[in-house]
Amino acid sequence: MAAEGLAGLLPAQTQLEYALLDADTPQEKENLVYQYLKKMDSRERDLTVPELSRDLQWLNTEGPISLHKDLCGKVVVLDFFTYCCINCLHLLPDLHELEHQYSDKDGLVIIGVHSAKFPNEKVLDSIKSAVLRYNIVHPVVNDADATLWHELEVSCWPTLVILGPRGNMLFSLVGEGHKEKLFLFTSITLKFYKERGQIKDNSIGIKLYKDSLPPSPLLFPGKVTVDKSGERLVIADTGHHRILVTLKNGQILHTIGGPNSGRKDGRFSEAAFNSPQGVAIKNNVIYVADTENHLIRKIDLELEIVTTVAGIGIQGVDKEGGAKGEEQPISSPWDVVFGNSVSGTQEDDVLWIAMAGIHQVWALMLEGGKLPKGSDLKKGVCLRFAGSGNEENRNNAYPHKAGFAQPSGLSLASEEPWNCLFVADSESSTVRMISLKDGAVKHLVGGERDPLNLFAFGDVDGAGINAKLQHPLGITWDKKRKLLYVADSYNHKIKVVDPKMKNCATLAGTGEASNVVGSSFTQSTFNEPGGLCIEENGRLVYVADTNNHQIKVLDLETKILSMLPILNPETCDVTDNLSVQKDQIANLPKLPKSAPNIQLPSLSAAPGQTIQFLLKLTLPPDSKLNEEAPNAWFITAEDNNTWLLQGQCLSGEIKDVSCQTVIPFQLPRVCLSAEAVLAIKACLYYCSKDSSACMMKGISFNQPLQIGSTNQGRLTQVELTHSFITN
């Protein structure tokens, strides 16, 4: 093995790249690369990549891969990446396109070498979530100690290393934006070695982790916001590439886009997004940071139309802006929030944008107006407001001289004495503030004083730079209490910041990546929460618990944490009108008199607690469900307990008895009695398999509830099982 690592490639590859600058035609470029490969291949000694340890953990494969045995005869692209890095994410579309063009049968294999920056990124489950979230379909190895990184003397994320069929290093590409070279180098390398008979077409045993993922209502939700009334939520269902608008009980009102990624304006049924993140709602208009499309989208809930208001659909490199929105290239917008211009006459006439891809904060003028230290701007203009574009933790009285590092969350505090934007600056692990009087950028908590040190992270409660965060992605301002809540994503916590005292403390979460809805905030767990918002009245905080695929609810008054059930209106009828609910139940089939009535043990529960009833019914042998009949479950309560039913999902279809039917129920946050009884009923129609006889059967389960303060917020599951027998 050559000891010099990637440095051994530098002299020859530098000469090649200078020569490519002078080449006029594609043929000239191909010839130059071909001659370079002849030179590299005839070296007395290969620059050979070291073998990976067999103890390393792999994803998307049937087992560990040997670079020198399993990949002998392959052209290999090693992608040294860490999943927090926006530049690494920008590279993924190029790799997707490359592996679509060339498969392992063609002789090409891409290997992701995950070399973590943050401690949380060394954990295999965290990498699994990232592989799923970003649709990575090539093998990934968890090089948690960055052994290969150090052996090759890699210096930054991302770095690509192209290997020949002997594990011989041929090229390296540092940073993003080298698509043309990547495709040129790869295609000529494949051609060069195929001519020499050194390329093998064997399969390497890909086994995609995403194929084992069970379906869920949400997939890696990135952000959530709530309207001023507190009645509607907007959820960026990022992994499903869609936006959901729900009632506060989780009933879906609108599904916009999904389930596949795309880029299309139009009606809700045809619109398409690509990994949307930040959302902001005012009245019946929603703005969306359509992150991987590099767009800002506008959703009109009345017209049910999606339009593009900023971005051109490809990643921009412009760090100034100033063009009209739909003509202005932008880069990986991660969050959006409404604000006010200095001279505007309308409220919420500016949309602030966390432009993570170029480490800046931008503004989209929704009306004509003026920004701090700026000139008058026309409606529709999109431009940089703060940040030089250099990735750093630099505070400055002049907004254009300040530096951010992947700003990912924004929240507005418009009242005095704040009048600022709070920024969750993820890669510097800080919370910053931008004055809306003069644009000055100041530090609040986290990080350290050296603006170039982006490794000052940790999990420490404290004040100012003594507090430590780890890659915070979300932030929301509680104007009632004058406090700031932060999604400290890689610490799996929600933290609270007092901006007056610059103090930061843990509000919820243990620091363990898990999914426990515990008896208190600090006994509950999250898994990389990416966004959060607070009701206008300051009571409920909604958290996008990203890797748990859930929305969690923190009640700041009762200190109860619960999970928000996502209720699909196609399979579940929900209304706040009890008379309507009673009519719906009245129209459902009546259970036959022979239907058993099963008394369940009393269940201790707390206001706001979520209960999942897991219904599993078994038909007699040689019977089958009559799928044309109205097979259904429904929930009822005695007349003196009807307060339990308001806003609940009271009925739904039973389509398949081979698996459990999940029936969600959430106790009201205000309970009128300490004791109550729910009845969960089911009605099935089934026939003998020879269709000689069909029948209707029913079952009722009575669930007594003891409502108190025990098990506060805990998700409780109750199994309801019954086997029908032939009379």
Swiss-Prot record:
Question: Where are NHL repeat segments found?
Answer: 207-249, 260-302, 330-364, 404-434, 456-500, 513-557
**One GO cellular component from the entry?**
cytosol
InterPro entries for this protein: 6-blade_b-propeller_TolB-like, NHL2_NHL_rpt_dom, NHL_repeat, Thioredoxin-like_fold, Thioredoxin-like_sf, Thioredoxin_domain
- Compartments in which it is found: Cytoplasm, Cytosol
Q: Where is the Thioredoxin domain?
A: 43-198
**What keyword terms does UniProt attach to this protein?**
Cytoplasm, Repeat
Relate the assembly described in the record.
Answer: Monomer.
According to its UniProt entry, the function of this protein is described as: Required for normal embryonic development.
Name used for this protein in its record: NHL repeat-containing protein 2
Gene that encodes it: NHLRC2
